[in-house]
Amino acid sequence: MLTGISGYVPLNALMKTVFSSPDAPPALGPYSQAIGAGPLIFFSGQVPLEAATGELVGQDVAEQTKQALLNLKSAGLSYANIIKTTVFLTDLSRFADMNAVYATFFPEAPPARSTIEVSGLPRGAKVEIEAIAIKPS
C-alpha cells in the first residue's frame, strides 16, 4: 500500500460517479460514457456518431474529428477542463487534417495528447478521441 506518498488518497475514499448524457451517443458496448473519480472525469473514446441517430458523421478525418470533439462537451464542461486526450487514427497520413480541426477546439494551452494509429475503429470511423478532464473547483 502506498502510505508514505504525500497527497495519497485511498481509492475507497474517492466517490465514483457515472456520467451519462443524451447529448452524446450511447456507449457501443458495456462501458460508461464517462466516469468521475475525485476531481477527474475519464471519458470513454468518442467516435463521430450523432447522438440522436447513432449514425456516423462525416466521411473524412476533419469532419469526424469535429464530431468526436463535440461529443466530449456533453458532460457540461468546457474544453479548457480537458487535460489529456488520446487520439486514435486509422490512417496516420491524415494527422495534419485532424490537427487542423483539433487546434480550433484548443486554441490556448492545449491538453497533453497522444496519437496512435490503429487498424480499425467501431462503425468504420476514421478517428476516435478519449479524454481526461478536471472538474472546475
Question: PLM features: residue spans?
Answer:
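Short, polar/acidic, helix-capping and beta-turn segments at strand->helix junctions
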Residues: 2-4, 8, 13-137
